[in-house]
């Protein structure tokens, strides 16, 4: 810690085990440093409230919720926000777990801080392991994983169906999917179906957003998660200079709470 303090960093990135994130973030905030913490910001409601209080007192804290910056998800979110679907009513997401999925659901449905009713259940699923963080798996091992399904019913009328098994992060046998529907159309993965200005149905493929940093990251061989984190860190420069939050802390805390 003393070596880090002596360097006078512009930013302290807290990437520790989940149980320690809130405490370590608080420690560095108390020292007067800006902090970018891993997700989730905290595991307990009291810790979430304490972090919010520090924020209100002027502490500079951001939480690295990165999924909305995934190039594939960013273009889908942009299509929804363009108004092409009308008002987004339903989101069916099978792309991430827990707080990441909640973040995406709230963004796709433009739900903000609306009250929400959450229901769900889980099942045990058997599947042959084919991939991992460290590379392909070829031993044919049959493993048990947990499939979780949750429904989020927002007070404003939007509903999200979350369906995810952790194996989907690294598997050749399970894919991920995104579907968002409004009265004028639907985004299903990278396909947009909607009505044009004349009321005629159109169908087109979504293309990546013009983001030079994301393009450079992809060209350098970074995967989507690495690209999203790089984009988040780049945007932190503006926040540290007094600009807007990269991802509102209120949203990051709400994601973790739900």
Provide a role label for each language-model segment.
Residues 3, 11-14, 59-60, 231-258:
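C-terminal helix-rich "cap/oligomerization" subdomain common to oxidoreductases
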Residues 4-9, 84-85:
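Glycine-rich phosphate-binding loop signature in dinucleotide/nucleotide-binding domains
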Residues 9-13, 17-18, 22-68:
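Beta-strand-loop-alpha-helix segment that lines the small-molecule cofactor/substrate pocket
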Residues 15, 38, 163-164, 182:
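Short, well-ordered coil/turn residues at beta-beta hairpins
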Residues 15, 150-157, 180-183:
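Active-site beta-strand termini and strand-to-loop segments that position acidic
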Residues 71-90:
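Rossmann-like NAD(P)H-binding beta-loop-alpha module
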Residues 87-175:
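Rossmann-like dinucleotide-binding domain that binds NAD(P)(H)
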Residues 168, 177-250:
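C-terminal glycine/acidic-rich active-site capping loop/insertion
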